[in-house]
Every structure is written in C-alpha cells, then in structure tokens.
C-alpha cells in the first residue's frame, strides 16, 4: 500500500459512521467535510516517513499517530477560517466549514476533530501503552499554549512579536510533532528529531508568507493577501520578498543535514529533498494585480 493510501485509509476509518457513533447528523457530516478531500497531507506523510526510516515496528501505532496529527491540523484550519480569526470563505478550493454549515457548528467540528485524534491515540494504547502515552503527551505539548499551535494563534493578539517564536509555534509546532511522533511511534527517542521538524516547519511558514504575498486565491485554493489584511507578523513584512527567499533557502539548506542517524536515513533524505524543491516553487513576482 502506498503512503498516501495508508494515511487516507486510516483517516477514513477514524471518521467512519461506526467510529463516530450516534453523533448529531450535521456534526457527523461536518467532521469529514473538514478533512476530505485533503490537501497534501504533508504532516502525516512526514510522520509515517520518519517511522519507516526508524523501522516502523508497530504500524498500528504509526497510523494512529498520523491520524491524530492530521486531525489536529484540520481542526486548526477549521478554527483559523472562523470570522474571529481569518474570516476565510474558502479552504482547499471549497467553502470553508463555517460557510458550508454555520459558525457554531464549525467551532464544535474543530473541537470534535482534535478530540477524536486523542481518542485514536488512547485506543492504540491497547497495542503499545508506553508509546501511546508518549504520543498523547507530545501532541498535547505541541498543540497547546506552551509553544504549540494555540500559542502561535495567540501571538497574533500581541503588540510585539518575535517572528521566529511565532513561526515555530504557528506552523513549526506540528512539523516538530510530525518528526518527533514518527520517531516515538517506532520506539525511538523524540528529542533528536526536533531540529528537522523545526526546519521543515519554518520553511513551510516562510513559503506560505511568500505565497500569500505573491499568489492569487485561485492558485492557492484559499484567500490571498491575508497577512496584510489581518496585520499578521510575516517574513515578507519583516525581510522583504528577496530577504524572505534567501532566508527560506538558508533554512532548507540545513534540513537534510539535521536528519538523525537511523536505518532509513538515505531514503528519508530523498523525501526531504523532494519537499525542499516543492517548497521553493514560488512565483518570482506577484500573480495578482
């Protein structure tokens, strides 16, 4: 089974009618709406790739970790799109969840998705309780107020913002979770995998800042120009277009070198290199007027 199919199959199972039970019908429909069809599934792909590089001796735990991470990411997107935050009408080329349903249901759907992720991790405790506990702790740490994605969103309410701290929390946290949870799922220590996740996360955030400044809404599948509209801290505002491009290159240059020693190190390096090429695929100048 391909990596894509493995991840998608695990997500479908986690959000199946059998898994959701007797949920209110609209909420039961809203949960998969917020997850399918997916984007690139970058975070769970990195997680599973790291687990495979480390031996992937417990695939059920790896799959649960990948599902929990992607559900947390999707929940954050549902909440990001709400009028209280980005007020975005489009997500992944279709109406954002609060537009397709309503705002209260979108809040509940986002909450339910992140809770479902922790349920999936708790369930796999029957397979390997030690790893499940570590995964729950790691995902909680990198989702909350202590440098997790909640902290990243909260930085936007501060008058003075450290761009590096903001990027690490807003985007980097779940990429750090991807590399560290992949290692944990395969029985490896998490700490050596921090730097790789941090670099990949920083690169994606800088690239996202550049795309927000240069690309059209049609090309991105979501509203463009949101950083300026919402007065968010961003790399382009701080460094300029060319400065942000140079910083992106510098961040990516050290990503492969930061891969810890593991049995599948060479193959993992190829995957990181592939993502680096994709990340750098940004227009040279603005596509919109």
Curated annotation (Swiss-Prot):
Q: Describe cofactor binding as the record notes it.
A: Binds 2 Mg(2+) ions per subunit.
GO biological process, alphabetically ordered? carotenoid biosynthetic process; chlorophyll biosynthetic process; geranylgeranyl diphosphate biosynthetic process; photosynthesis
**Which residues does the annotation say bind Mg(2+) 1?**
80, 86
The cross-references to Pfam families, in alphabetical order and at most eight, read: polyprenyl_synt
- Keyword Magnesium carried by entry: yes
- Pathway the protein takes part in: Isoprenoid biosynthesis; geranylgeranyl diphosphate biosynthesis; geranylgeranyl diphosphate from farnesyl diphosphate and isopentenyl diphosphate: step 1/1
- Indicate which residues the UniProt annotation says bind (2E,6E)-farnesyl diphosphate: 91, 170-171, 205
Top-tier EC class: transferase
Q: Which UniProt keywords apply?
A: Carotenoid biosynthesis, Chlorophyll biosynthesis, Isoprene biosynthesis, Magnesium, Metal-binding, Photosynthesis, Transferase
What reaction does this catalyse?
Answer: isopentenyl diphosphate + (2E,6E)-farnesyl diphosphate = (2E,6E,10E)-geranylgeranyl diphosphate + diphosphate
Q: What is its EC number?
A: 2.5.1.29
GO molecular function terms listed in the Swiss-Prot or TrEMBL record: geranylgeranyl diphosphate synthase activity; metal ion binding
Residue positions annotated to bind isopentenyl diphosphate are 43, 73, 92
The record's listing under SUPFAM superfamilies reads: Terpenoid synthases
Q: Which residues does Mg(2+) 2 bind? A: 80, 86
Which co-factors does it depend on? Mg(2+)
Reported function: Catalyzes the condensation of farnesyl diphosphate (FPP) and isopentenyl diphosphate (IPP) to yield geranylgeranyl diphosphate (GGPP) needed for biosynthesis of carotenoids and diterpenes.
The UniProt entry's sequence similarity note says: Belongs to the FPP/GGPP synthase family.
Protein's UniProt name = Geranylgeranyl diphosphate synthase
Q: Tell me what organism the protein belongs to.
A: Rhodobacter capsulatus (strain ATCC BAA-309 / NBRC 16581 / SB1003)
Q: Which gene encodes it?
A: crtE
């Amino acid at each position: 089974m391909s990596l894509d199919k493995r991840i998608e199959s695990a997500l479908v199972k986690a959000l199946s009618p059998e898994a959701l039970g007797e949920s209110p019908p609209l909420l039961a429909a809203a949960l998969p709406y917020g997850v399918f069809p997916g984007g690139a599934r970058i975070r769970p792909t990195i997680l599973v790739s790291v687990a495979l590089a480390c031996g992937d001796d417990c695939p059920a735990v790896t799959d649960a970790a990948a599902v929990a991470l992607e559900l947390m990411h999707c929940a954050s997107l549902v909440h990001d799109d709400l009028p209280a935050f980005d007020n975005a009408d489009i997500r992944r080329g279709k109406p954002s969840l609060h537009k397709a349903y309503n705002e209260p249901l979108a809040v509940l759907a986002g909450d339910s998705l992140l809770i479902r992720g922790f349920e999936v991790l708790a369930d796999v405790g029957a397979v390997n309780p030690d790893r499940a506990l570590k995964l729950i702790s790691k995902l909680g740490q990198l989702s909350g107020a202590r440098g997790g994605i909640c902290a990243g969103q909260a930085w936007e309410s501060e008058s003075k913002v450290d761009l590096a701290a903001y990027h690490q929390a807003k985007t980097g946290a779940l990429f750090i979770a991807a590399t560290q949870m992949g290692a944990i799922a395969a029985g490896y220590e998490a700490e050596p995998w921090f730097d790789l996740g941090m670099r990949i996360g920083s690169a994606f955030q800088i690239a996202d800042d550049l795309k927000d400044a240069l690309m059209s809404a049609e090309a991105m599948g979501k509203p463009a120009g949101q950083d300026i509209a919402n007065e968010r801290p961003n790399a382009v505002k701080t460094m300029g277009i060319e400065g942000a491009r140079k910083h992106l290159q510098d961040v990516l240059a050290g990503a492969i070198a930061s891969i810890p020693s593991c049995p599948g190190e060479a193959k993992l390096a190829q995957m990181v290199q592939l993502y680096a090429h994709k990340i750098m695929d940004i227009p040279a100048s603005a596509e919109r007027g």
